[in-house]
């Protein structure tokens, strides 16, 4: 399972140590996707609110530009998967694409925390690029853990998607709680940056 993509011969499935009846790397991919979705949804719930509070003084006039930026961000996050899939297939391979995407996303998430609107926009663009490299390719890696016809493949994908759903479910609850308790949010200026 090299980092480079090959199209002319199917990759042989390497033997992995089994954990709970599945290849050990499945659990690493499960946790990786859990934390990626945690970061995505942990930021997503508060993004428009944060933009209005931080860059428009909480004024309702900031709702329209915040909503436009939020909408553009979400649309581009999902559209970037086309770019990321192509890059993985034709240029750097799935593993390298996932690693590069994770590093780029992390850099973007740190930029989003900077209290400057230009840096926020650059950070969102960076998250978009990283997500495009990461998101379409991690599912491909799950598929490569199992040989064609392996009966465990469906349950492996079910477990993987449980990681996605758990990250999405826990993120808004935990980040909201942390913003309130640790960062001193108040009714007039919630601590939207966790």
Q: What do these predicted regions represent?
A:
Residues 1-41:
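Cytosolic juxtamembrane N-terminal segment immediately preceding the first transmembrane helix
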Residues 77, 154-183:
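Glycine-rich segments within core transmembrane alpha-helices of 12-TM secondary carriers
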Residues 133-148:
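Intracellular juxtamembrane helix-capping segments at the cytosolic ends
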Residues 62, 177-194:
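A membrane-interface helix-boundary motif in multi-pass transporters
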